[in-house]
Amino acid sequence: MKKVVVGLSGGVDSSTAAAILHHQGYEVIGLTLWLMKGKGQCCSEGMIDAADLCEQLGVPHQIVDIRDLFQTHIVDYLVTGYSAGITPLPCSQCNKTVKFGPMVQYAREELGCDRIATGHYARISYDEATGRYQLLRAIDRNKDQSYFLYDLSQDLLAATIFPLGELEKTDTRRIATEYGLKTADKPESQDLCLVESNGSMRAFLDKYLAPKSGDIVDTTGKILGQHDGVHHYTIGQRKGLGIAAAEPLYVIELDAENNKVVVGDRTKVTQPECTVNRVNWVSIAEPSTPIHAEVQIRYRSTPTPVTVIPLENSRVRLVFDEPQFSITPGQAAVWYDGEKVLGGGIIEQFS
């Protein structure tokens, strides 16, 4: 019997993924990662629901404590980034370094198993011509999570199964109901786990970063107002600035060194290109010449035509066919060829 370790958060997606594999004849081992320190309500409730699911399916359930790893790679990563004036994207970092990597390692070393599965909405295929595993969008485009998975290595993709990749979300809930899963009607998480457990990103950051008042200025240096910390702002932000102006103003720069928030009109926050670092080439090997693709600079942004120009040291330059609004340092840029994820990386700060 084929053995697979299924990552269980206690939600309907991971529960259904486990149930599907169980009914397909896999020997399923449920695995829940204990992520957050303190009274992280989402984790404790998720652990209970995951344990209940495994009892219902008659499969073993294990909990692995990786709170220190989560603290280092996610909490500290976020706090350091925001304090430096960038807006980090924790999800892709978490998937690679906290979830998939440790899950595969634990499965291989502790459970003698070389396959894992999760409830993510994405697909994986193998290209025999290139010898590479390809990451593809999910069938349900509205639930597609490939943007957050671009940083998975070939080794991790080879070890992973996405049972929900071919399903619509409505199908997932229908299957969960048919299997009689207790999580079938469980509401979806609406935000980052850290945000849900703290109430807001601002509340989370306030636990680690003290208020630090400074000036909100325009591009000439004129003081327009005050702020209580650059970490409370993000590029492209318009609301919540607390300043009056004849025309709409947006955050165009976060000058953490001088503790200033710089604002300007919409043209000042629209860019024709950007540089991306920590690039991971997924479905294709790194090209030696520029390629044309479609890029997403945010999770829900519309894919836009782009020229991807390879640079040294795992970096690329993205030149957009049309200038893009609110390109945010710290967020991921992920480029596609149709449904295929070609590569992605982290947007650098503008010099």
Swiss-Prot record:
Region (Interaction with tRNA): 143-145, 298-299
CDD domains from the UniProt entry: MnmA_TRMU-like
GO MF terms, alphabetically ordered: ATP binding; tRNA binding; tRNA-uridine 2-sulfurtransferase activity
Record's subcellular location: Cytoplasm
InterPro entries named among the record's database cross-references: MnmA-like, MnmA-like_C, MnmA-like_central, MnmA-like_central_sf, Rossmann-like_a/b/a_fold
GO biological process entries: tRNA wobble position uridine thiolation
Catalytic activity entry: S-sulfanyl-L-cysteinyl-[protein] + uridine(34) in tRNA + AH2 + ATP = 2-thiouridine(34) in tRNA + L-cysteinyl-[protein] + A + AMP + diphosphate + H(+)
A Pfam family this chain is assigned to: tRNA_Me_trans
GO CC field: cytoplasm
Residues the entry annotates as binding ATP: 7-14, 33, 119
SS bonds (residue pairs): 94-193
EC numbers: 2.8.1.13
Site location (Interaction with tRNA): 120, 331
Domain of life: Bacteria
Active site as annotated: 94, 193
Role this protein plays: Catalyzes the 2-thiolation of uridine at the wobble position (U34) of tRNA, leading to the formation of s(2)U34.
Protein family per UniProt: Belongs to the MnmA/TRMU family.
The protein's name: tRNA-specific 2-thiouridylase MnmA
